[in-house]
Amino acid sequence: DSSTSRGLGDVYKRQVGGNAGQPETAAARKIMGQAKASRAYAYYYLAQLFQNSYDPAQPILPYYDGELTETAKVPASQIYALVVSDLTEAVELLDGYARPDKSKIDKTVAQGLLAYVHAGMGNFAEAKVMADAVIASGYPVTTAGELAYPGAGSGFNNVDTPSWVWGFDLSEELGHELIDGWGGMDVFE
């Protein structure tokens, strides 16, 4: 019933039990995996905004564990531990999920995000393991030719470029949905 739903958070709590939930069905595992990957990505994005380079001891963000009480900033190490934990769980939960298109988060997206986070923390060996897993799953490294080609078929202009793991095919049908939401979520764009 959409009249009582409060979005993904409500579905996450009702269908999979929130943070403590143990999803039993494939649908519940998908929801939990995508929710954890989304939360990890949001926290990582915020961490990048409030810290120029990874300093585990620097207090950067408040950490909310489900209680809606005001909380103080916690050290980056605590935020990054949550991010790594969420993405690691997302990789496990999304194993076997076949997404309908590149706009959905699947195991490979979670692995790519985890590689990104490990690289940001200076954990280059772990970043390589995750990046290699993404490449091994069928996403090759973008070639110089794909990047240099001007126009509609180049590496950054087409979601169908083989190396793109996660993205949206921008079209008029999307309206303002992407522009107003996740479309501007990467600090490096």
Label for each model-derived stretch:
Residues 1-49, 78, 92-97:
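Conserved, well-structured interaction surfaces
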Residues 16, 50, 87, 94, ...:
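Alpha-helical junction/boundary sensor with strong preference for TPR arrays
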Residues 47-55, 98-99, 120-123:
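Short coil/turn linking the two alpha-helices of tandem helical-hairpin repeats
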Residues 68, 128-189:
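Hydrophobic-face positions in mid-chain alpha helices that act as interaction patches
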